[in-house]
């Protein structure tokens, strides 16, 4: 089926309207999915794309996926998919799908400068194991590392965490969720002592107002946006406010569309807190019972190398310190953020700021705040999260139907795998951390490994991994289920030089020859989505399972198979010091596979528990139900203290279940009596992630970005996504309809900025920052209408690597890069 761009956009509009009206799948979608054809077998799965967690029905025939449609029984999307979801089958069958391992070779041997040559899995793992063993022997665990994914299944991430943190004794494991959700994680932990939202999508149908902070839900979370649209259009009292540094699709529904100067969201948040206090809108009873106030450290730097002038100038680089503060002192602190000052610093008219503050302050208006990368990809992203929580805590508009702060995720299992499993460099499962001795002991006991196996120091985060690769300190490196060479910041500074450094051996596991894969030394072909059994955890704490439905092409293998098979190449004697092994001499001579995955926990469920009519390549390769074993071992970390997951088998029968799950019942609103089983009768609200059960309001000021426009580099650059493509486009650009709809990246620029530079729509233009340059196409119209002084460019296009321009400044607390703010200049080509 062929769609013009006009038809494509019309189809998406139809989809949104259908959702708002409660209709079934639009005609164009039925044509694409070929629903109802004879001989098609249907089964459920969560969508492969964003963190919304939509349910789809996958149609298979003769060993191939031939159709998909929205699952009418899925509570998230109620039968509707966005335009990407309708084309899911086609992401599996790109013409350049990888089907066998490829190793750089010259003269029949591995060579860093050689050509990619097909090899067997044994050959691939022989070379790879030799490189990892050599590095471990010569330099130790700190020289090996892995960059994983929020697209991993739950058990893939868990298996990876065990292999690196226990097997190789290296905490140098970090997910690409570092680039998108790390600020949200640290924000949750600082304020509440536990990660992830307290609310759920059911808030949408009960809220009176929605405030979007740096979130273009209309394009990035279109199914949730359709539910908000339905709520707004069916009740004229419902209001929508959208805050962004440029006008985008979500503005079409906004009652209060706000464009602010980059970084000044911090000012707006403090102004709202000030307004609430000055107008006696504080829920004082809630504050007295459930909230503490602390003053946070300031001037904390920008996460750059210690030699950078900005880091040298910082008074408290990387500091997470805070001290108790009285309410009166907090009141005085935010009093500086007046309406007049805020309007001047942000460029937002006073009447719009006042209207926004009144939404939050009115005790009769239930408000949900949503945010994504505008908050998180921010050099003060953690602070932005904390300041938003302040507003909800001051007003008591939290942890109850229709009220709450909600961080939306961009990947299908950034929550379920990266965060809950603990595949960050500092984390273990269920919000535990490697720096806590008790937490390490819990993990070591559950994993049946010697005390002291897991290192007590935080490993290298994403940007630090890039720097260590360039510096020759990280030498054996495995990248799995992501395209970080294209997606990460400041490509030319550290990452590309590090990957191509002859001291380093780089492995990439991927279904397609991405920019990352083609920059590596060894490419391992990977099974995708329903070519394996899997589990994802979405943004509302909903865990969803699916069965394997087709086989992967050629010799492609799942990430789980790759991790476990690779572990067979190492004995504990080769990777653990003798003193450690002496604590458990019975483990001597065993492989990491035997110690980590055949430990009496993971292998406890026999193969006959896999339904005979179901595909499950990994289980049959292992000889036991490996997914169930991994999941149940992992779930044991969280049960009993607010991270409770249901039994494995329950998920295959359900359309997802939201944790904590106690006595078979899911939890919709956490921390609230009557909804959360961990809040006792009479407590009303208890933020039990904190020892005293109280959340924390943080006093945090505005601080400037790491880089701003000047006379030479006179424009802000912001990067992001578009509706048609997901992240780096490695899947969506292989769908002809999606590719044709948005074939290449463009540079969105204000018409007056273009005119001042002698540019017209469609002109080729060179975009330059202090770090790199590229050529793009001028776009002065369309969906993104940027203000003067700012340009916007999506990052899906491998031919226009926008991240050669971006700065690798990070939030010093979360280590998440700021992709939304750097300075560029442009000139006509």
From Swiss-Prot:
<dbReference type="InterPro" id="IPR041957">
    <property type="entry name" value="CT_Nitrate-R-NapA-like"/>
</dbReference>
<dbReference type="Pfam" id="PF10518">
    <property type="entry name" value="TAT_signal"/>
</dbReference>
<feature type="binding site">
    <location>
        <begin position="509"/>
        <end position="510"/>
    </location>
    <ligand>
        <name>Mo-bis(molybdopterin guanine dinucleotide)</name>
    </ligand>
</feature>
<keyword id="KW-0560">Oxidoreductase</keyword>
<feature type="binding site">
    <location>
        <begin position="213"/>
        <end position="220"/>
    </location>
    <ligand>
        <name>Mo-bis(molybdopterin guanine dinucleotide)</name>
    </ligand>
</feature>
<feature type="binding site">
    <location>
        <position position="180"/>
    </location>
    <ligand>
        <name>Mo-bis(molybdopterin guanine dinucleotide)</name>
    </ligand>
</feature>
<keyword id="KW-0574">Periplasm</keyword>
<comment type="subunit">
    <text>Component of the periplasmic nitrate reductase NapAB complex composed of NapA and NapB.</text>
</comment>
<keyword id="KW-0732">Signal</keyword>
<feature type="binding site">
    <location>
        <position position="820"/>
    </location>
    <ligand>
        <name>Mo-bis(molybdopterin guanine dinucleotide)</name>
    </ligand>
</feature>
<dbReference type="GO" id="GO:0042128">
    <property type="term" value="P:nitrate assimilation"/>
</dbReference>
<dbReference type="GO" id="GO:0050140">
    <property type="term" value="F:nitrate reductase (cytochrome) activity"/>
</dbReference>
<feature type="binding site">
    <location>
        <position position="54"/>
    </location>
    <ligand>
        <name>[4Fe-4S] cluster</name>
    </ligand>
</feature>
<dbReference type="InterPro" id="IPR027467">
    <property type="entry name" value="MopterinOxRdtase_cofactor_BS"/>
</dbReference>
<dbReference type="InterPro" id="IPR006311">
    <property type="entry name" value="TAT_signal"/>
</dbReference>
<keyword id="KW-0411">Iron-sulfur</keyword>
<feature type="binding site">
    <location>
        <position position="50"/>
    </location>
    <ligand>
        <name>[4Fe-4S] cluster</name>
    </ligand>
</feature>
<dbReference type="InterPro" id="IPR019546">
    <property type="entry name" value="TAT_signal_bac_arc"/>
</dbReference>
<dbReference type="GO" id="GO:0006777">
    <property type="term" value="P:Mo-molybdopterin cofactor biosynthetic process"/>
</dbReference>
<feature type="binding site">
    <location>
        <position position="47"/>
    </location>
    <ligand>
        <name>[4Fe-4S] cluster</name>
    </ligand>
</feature>
<keyword id="KW-0534">Nitrate assimilation</keyword>
<feature type="signal peptide" description="Tat-type signal">
    <location>
        <begin position="1"/>
        <end position="31"/>
    </location>
</feature>
<feature type="binding site">
    <location>
        <position position="151"/>
    </location>
    <ligand>
        <name>Mo-bis(molybdopterin guanine dinucleotide)</name>
    </ligand>
</feature>
<dbReference type="GO" id="GO:0043546">
    <property type="term" value="F:molybdopterin cofactor binding"/>
</dbReference>
<keyword id="KW-0249">Electron transport</keyword>
<dbReference type="GO" id="GO:0009325">
    <property type="term" value="C:nitrate reductase complex"/>
</dbReference>
<dbReference type="GO" id="GO:0051539">
    <property type="term" value="F:4 iron, 4 sulfur cluster binding"/>
</dbReference>
<dbReference type="InterPro" id="IPR006656">
    <property type="entry name" value="Mopterin_OxRdtase"/>
</dbReference>
<dbReference type="InterPro" id="IPR006963">
    <property type="entry name" value="Mopterin_OxRdtase_4Fe-4S_dom"/>
</dbReference>
<dbReference type="GO" id="GO:0030151">
    <property type="term" value="F:molybdenum ion binding"/>
</dbReference>
<dbReference type="InterPro" id="IPR050123">
    <property type="entry name" value="Prok_molybdopt-oxidoreductase"/>
</dbReference>
<feature type="binding site">
    <location>
        <position position="803"/>
    </location>
    <ligand>
        <name>Mo-bis(molybdopterin guanine dinucleotide)</name>
    </ligand>
</feature>
<feature type="domain" description="4Fe-4S Mo/W bis-MGD-type">
    <location>
        <begin position="40"/>
        <end position="96"/>
    </location>
</feature>
<keyword id="KW-0500">Molybdenum</keyword>
<dbReference type="InterPro" id="IPR009010">
    <property type="entry name" value="Asp_de-COase-like_dom_sf"/>
</dbReference>
<dbReference type="GO" id="GO:0009055">
    <property type="term" value="F:electron transfer activity"/>
</dbReference>
<protein>
    <recommendedName>
        <fullName>Periplasmic nitrate reductase</fullName>
        <ecNumber>1.9.6.1</ecNumber>
    </recommendedName>
</protein>
<feature type="binding site">
    <location>
        <position position="377"/>
    </location>
    <ligand>
        <name>Mo-bis(molybdopterin guanine dinucleotide)</name>
    </ligand>
</feature>
<dbReference type="GO" id="GO:0042597">
    <property type="term" value="C:periplasmic space"/>
</dbReference>
<feature type="binding site">
    <location>
        <position position="373"/>
    </location>
    <ligand>
        <name>Mo-bis(molybdopterin guanine dinucleotide)</name>
    </ligand>
</feature>
<feature type="binding site">
    <location>
        <position position="559"/>
    </location>
    <ligand>
        <name>Mo-bis(molybdopterin guanine dinucleotide)</name>
    </ligand>
</feature>
<dbReference type="GO" id="GO:0005506">
    <property type="term" value="F:iron ion binding"/>
</dbReference>
């Amino acid at each position: 089926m062929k769609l013009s761009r006009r038809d494509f956009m019309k189809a998406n509009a139809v989809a949104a309207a259908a959702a708002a009206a409660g209709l079934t799948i639009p005609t164009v979608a039925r044509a694409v999915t070929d629903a109802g054809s004879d001989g098609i077998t249907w089964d459920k799965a969560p969508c492969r794309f964003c963190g919304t967690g939509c349910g789809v029905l996958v149609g298979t025939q003769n060993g191939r996926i031939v159709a998909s449609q929205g699952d009418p029984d899925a509570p998230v999307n109620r039968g509707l998919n966005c335009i990407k979801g309708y084309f899911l089958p086609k992401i599996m069958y790109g013409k350049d799908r990888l089907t066998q391992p490829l190793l750089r070779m010259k003269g029949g041997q591995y060579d860093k400068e050689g050509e990619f040559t097909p090899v067997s899995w044994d050959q691939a793992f022989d070379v790879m194991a030799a490189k990892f063993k050599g590095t471990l022997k010569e330099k130790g665990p700190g020289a090996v590392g892995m960059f994983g994914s929020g697209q991993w299944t739950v058990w893939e991430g868990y298996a990876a965490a065990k292999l690196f943190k226990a097997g190789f004794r290296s905490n140098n494991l970090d997910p690409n969720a570092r680039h998108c959700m790390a600020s949200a994680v640290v924000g949750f932990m600082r304020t509440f002592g536990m990660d992830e939202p307290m609310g759920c999508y059911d808030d949408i149908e009960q809220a009176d107002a929605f405030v979007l902070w740096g979130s273009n839900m209309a394009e990035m979370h279109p199914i949730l946006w359709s539910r908000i649209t339905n709520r707004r259009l069916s009740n004229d009292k419902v209001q929508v406010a959208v805050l962004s540094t440029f006008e985008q699709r979500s503005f079409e529904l906004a009652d209060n569309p706000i464009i602010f100067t980059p970084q000044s969201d911090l000012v707006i948040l403090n102004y709202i807190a000030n307004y609430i206090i000055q107008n006696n809108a504080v829920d004082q009873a809630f504050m007295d019972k459930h909230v503490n106030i602390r003053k946070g450290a300031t001037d904390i730097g920008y996460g750059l190398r210690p030699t950078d002038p900005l880091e040298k100038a910082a008074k408290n680089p990387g500091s997470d310190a805070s001290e108790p503060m009285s309410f009166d002192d907090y009141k005085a602190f935010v009093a500086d953020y007046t309406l007049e000052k805020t309007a001047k610093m942000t460029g937002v008219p006073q009447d719009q700021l006042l209207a926004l503050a009144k939404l939050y302050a009115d005790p009769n208006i239930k408000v949900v705040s949503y945010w994504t990368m505008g908050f998180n990809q921010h050099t003060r992203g953690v602070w932005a999260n904390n300041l938003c929580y302040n507003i909800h805590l001051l007003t008591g508009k939290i942890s109850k139907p229709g009220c709450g702060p909600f961080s939306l995720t961009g990947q299908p299992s950034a929550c379920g795998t990266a965060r809950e499993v603990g595949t960050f460099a500092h984390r273990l499962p269920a919000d535990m951390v490697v720096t806590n001795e008790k937490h390490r002991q819990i993990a070591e006991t559950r994993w049946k490994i010697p005390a002291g196996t897991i290192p007590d120091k935080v490993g290298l985060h994403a940007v630090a991994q890039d720097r260590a690769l360039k510096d020759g300190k990280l030498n054996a490196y495995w990248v799995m289920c992501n395209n970080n060479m294209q997606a990460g910041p400041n490509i030319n500074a550290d990452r590309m030089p590090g990957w191509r450094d002859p001291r380093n051996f780089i492995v990439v596991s991927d279904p397609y020859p991405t920019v990352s894969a083609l920059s590596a030394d060894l490419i391992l072909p990977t099974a995708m989505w329903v070519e394996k059994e899997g589990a994802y955890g979405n943004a509302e704490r909903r865990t969803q399972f699916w069965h394997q439905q087709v086989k992967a092409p050629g010799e492609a293998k799942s990430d789980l198979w790759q991790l476990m098979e690779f572990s067979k190449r190492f004995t504990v004697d080769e990777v653990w010091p003798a003193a450690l092994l002496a604590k458990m001499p019975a483990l001597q001579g065993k492989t990491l596979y035997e110690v980590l995955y055949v430990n009496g926990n993971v292998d406890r469920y026999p193969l006959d528990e896999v339904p005979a009519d179901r595909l499950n390549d990994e289980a049959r390769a292992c000889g036991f139900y490996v997914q169930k074993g991994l999941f149940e071992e992992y779930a044991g970390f969280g049960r009993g203290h607010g991270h409770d997951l249901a039994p494995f088998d329950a998920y295959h029968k359900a359309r997802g279940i939201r944790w904590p799950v106690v006595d078979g019942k899911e939890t919709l609103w956490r921390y609230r009596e009557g909804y959360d089983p961990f809040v006792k009768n009479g407590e009303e609200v208890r933020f039990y992630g904190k020892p005293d059960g109280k959340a924390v309001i943080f006093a945090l000021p505005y601080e400037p970005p790491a880089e701003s426009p000047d006379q030479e580099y006179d424009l802000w650059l912001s990067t992001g996504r578009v509706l048609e493509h997901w992240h780096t486009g490695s899947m969506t650009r292989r769908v002809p309809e999606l590719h044709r709809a948005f074939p290449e990246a463009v540079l969105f620029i204000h018409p007056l900025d273009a005119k001042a530079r002698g540019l017209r729509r469609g002109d080729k233009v060179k975009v330059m920052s202090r770090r790199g340059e590229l050529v793009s196409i001028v776009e002065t119209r369309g969906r993104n209408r940027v203000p003067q002084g700012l340009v916007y460019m999506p990052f899906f296009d491998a031919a226009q690597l926008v991240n050669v321009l971006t700065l690798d400044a990070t939030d010093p607390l979360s280590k998440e890069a700021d992709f939304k703010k750097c300075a560029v200049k442009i000139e006509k080509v």
